[in-house]
A protein has these predicted regions:
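Domain-level signal for soluble alpha/beta catalytic cores
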Residues: 1-474, 480-640
Length: 640
């Protein structure tokens, strides 16, 4: 067997070791003692434990480095480098004694501090701590790094980036899920799979918290969301509340693990309460079990996510356009004075109105766009659960935002120009994002659908050439103004149709530009949106605060048999207050322009937003502590 983890993963199955803490406690480790220090003070004890797991059939053993970060070691008098070097040495010695082909994993657990915004540890500080561990492990000769027992997806991201940017080690990550299929911080299985797969880990999975039987629903769902090798390291069942002993025997454990093979699991091991006897039983089960070959490659749906919510692009989804200073005087003033509350209110209002994803653009002369984008992404993610679309023309701004974003975002945008392709696509690949491709190039926006289609093809080919999967490429065929280029309206719609049906890509359109310079803009936008949806538009970028626009999407999904049994439509409108019909002959109210985002013009019947949405906005505003965020929602709720 080649000593290479990626080659090892090509086998039918791989066996990892079991618990280290359980073995150290059985050997007499005192309460409160730092386990990692024993690698220096009692090296033969550690070598002996590793040897037992190797003899039991483990292909990979974890070095005694779980808590070897500077935060946890600050009171023990030992450095990260000292602990890691000694621990890797002990594990490698055990391999030489028993199985020279076995691999040694640098085992890395959570830092022990909560990251912002829940805690006080910054992303950069977490990254630096993981960098220190990874550099020490790589120098000491580890064969791979495993980040395990993780609960915070953003901390996972910091760890993975540190490993990839400061070593060539293969990377595996296992997170810890509760019975509700969420981690302690609320991370869901779908978001874990989407984010970590995008970051390019070699394997991912679950460990700790529950026994094999209790973890089965978690494993089942995870198997639906990734084609990467899956690791399962459960506890030895659940602890008895009286004796504190785990309730599953080695033989029972192996039988339960056998039952998980139907989900295509590649890597089997144990966590708390497991011993070499457990690993021996698992190894023997795998060696004798004829039920191999369960794994098959699955089609993962196009999706983006926050840590707590995944949004699949399997039906039309609304991207809220309001967090953008273009043409918005109040927004520009808020950016110039650093008023983040204004931006957060825009986020809450759009979600309450029906946005599935929020576009975030803070480009404005006179401000530091990079720092403002970082602040906006962090602040918005602290109070809402929808995914974000990071919108900037500056690659450095995109890089900074993608780095701190928690989950899998959309990048807006790349285009067919060579400089754009070279600058943006590598960022999309590195951070595992989705990307909007604009059908323009060095010659501008082609007037004909055929030429826009060719640019879309080129963007897709370049993306796939560097490893960006097809499902992460969304194409914007670009909306031109009907008042100036009326013949171009159908060209845009034809391009959308061809990109969707011939290339099989998801499509995006900024809708409101169609009506620029025309009266009654809402009407034009509304009808154009409906036409675009019929031609295959997946992601309309609209102002969700205009009821006619969100209503068009909801009604389309109902009529196209996407919204089964009209569930979403009824939920949105069943309790809608009656609205007095407007006299079509009435003149517009003073100050009404009919522009997108303004008061509706005469002849338009306004549809009310359900009261529940306003209450939800008020809740989030209070929860987030917005200085200016509560009053508008309080007034709306009172009226309704």
């Amino acid at each position: 067997m080649d000593k290479n983890f990626r080659e090892l993963l090509k086998k039918e199955y791989v066996v990892f070791d079991g618990a280290m803490g359980t073995m150290l406690q059985a050997a007499g480790m005192k309460m409160g003692e730092t386990p990692e220090v024993l690698s220096i003070t009692q090296p033969q004890l550690l070598v002996g434990i590793h040897e037992k797991y190797l003899r039991a059939g483990a292909d990979v053993i974890y070095a005694n480095t779980f808590g070897a970060n500077r935060y946890k070691l600050e009171e023990c008098g030992k450095s990260v480098d000292e602990i890691v070097k000694a621990s890797i040495k002990n594990a490698k010695q055990a391999c030489e004694n028993v199985n020279p082909q076995a691999l040694v994993a640098l085992d890395v657990g959570p830092i022990g501090q909560l990251l912002e915004p829940t805690g006080t540890l910054s992303f950069e500080e977490a990254y630096d701590m993981y960098r220190e561990i990874v550099e020490a492990g790589s120098a000491a000769g580890a064969d791979l790094v495993v980040f395990e027992t993780m609960t915070d997806l953003l901390e996972c991201k910091a760890a993975v980036l540190a490993a990839k940017e400061h070593s060539d080690l293969p990377v595996a990550v296992t997170m810890t899920f509760e019975i509700n299929q969420r981690t302690f911080t609320g991370c869901c299985i779908e978001s874990m799979a989407l984010t970590l797969s995008g970051l390019g880990v070699d394997a991912l999975g679950v460990n700790c918290s529950l026994g094999p039987a209790e973890l089965e629903p978690v494993v089942a769902k995870l198997s639906e969301w990734t084609n990467l090798p899956i690791i399962v390291k459960p506890n030895a069942g659940l602890p008895d509340p009286v004796t504190n002993e785990y309730n599953v025997s080695p033989e029972e454990f192996a039988q339960m693990m056998k039952n998980l093979r139907k989900y295509g699991i590649k890597v089997f091991g144990g966590c708390c309460g497991t011993t070499p006897d457990f690993i021996r039983c698992v190894s023997e089960m795998l060696h004798t079990d004829d039920n191999a070959g369960f794994w098959h490659e699955k089609e993962i749906p196009a999706a983006v996510c926050s840590p707590t919510k995944a949004v699949t692009i399997t039906e039309p989804r609304i991207i809220g356009e309001r967090i953008n200073p273009t043409g918005k005087k109040l927004f520009k003033e808020a950016l110039l004075r650093g008023d983040m509350d204004y931006i957060l209110n825009q986020a809450l209002e759009q979600i309450g109105a029906g946005a599935d994803i929020l576009d975030v653009n803070v480009g404005l002369p006179g401000i530091d766009e990079k720092e403002m984008m970082i602040s906006a992404v962090k602040s918005i993610q602290a109070i809402v659960d929808v995914p974000l679309q990071v919108d900037s023309t500056i690659p450095e701004v995109l890089d900074a935002a993608l780095r701190v974003y928690n989950g899998k975002p959309i990048v807006n945008s790349v285009n067919g120009e060579e400089k754009s392709l070279k600058a943006v696509l590598p960022l999309v690949k590195k951070y595992g994002a989705a990307v909007v491709g604009l059908t323009l190039d060095e010659n501008g926006i082609p007037p004909k659908a055929e030429d826009r289609f060719k640019i879309a093809q080129r963007i897709l080919e370049r993306a796939q050439a560097i490893g960006i999967p097809k499902e992460n490429v969304y194409i914007d065929c670009l909306t031109l103004t009907a008042s100036a280029e009326q013949e171009g309206v159908m060209e845009t719609l034809n391009a959308v149709y061809r990109v969707k049906h011939e290339l099989g890509l998801k499509t995006v359109l900024g809708v409101s530009n169609i009506s620029f310079g025309l009266p009654n803009r809402v009407l034009v936008n509304h009808i154009f949106l409906t036409m675009a949806l019929q031609n295959g538009l997946d992601l309309p970028i609209i102002n969700p605060n205009i009821p006619e626009m969100t209503g068009a999407v909801r009604a389309y999904k109902l009529l196209a048999n996407i919204d089964k049994n009209s569930v979403d439509y009824i939920k949105a409108y069943a309790n809608m207050p009656k609205v007095e019909k407007i006299n079509p002959a009435a003149k517009p109210a003073a100050g009404s322009t009919g522009a997108a985002g303004s008061a509706a013009p005469a002849g338009t019947q306004t549809v009310a937003v359900p009261a529940g949405d306003c209450k939800e906005q008020l809740f989030h505003a209070v929860y987030a502590g917005l200085k200016n965020g509560c009053e508008p929602h309080k007034r709306t709720v009172k009226r309704q």
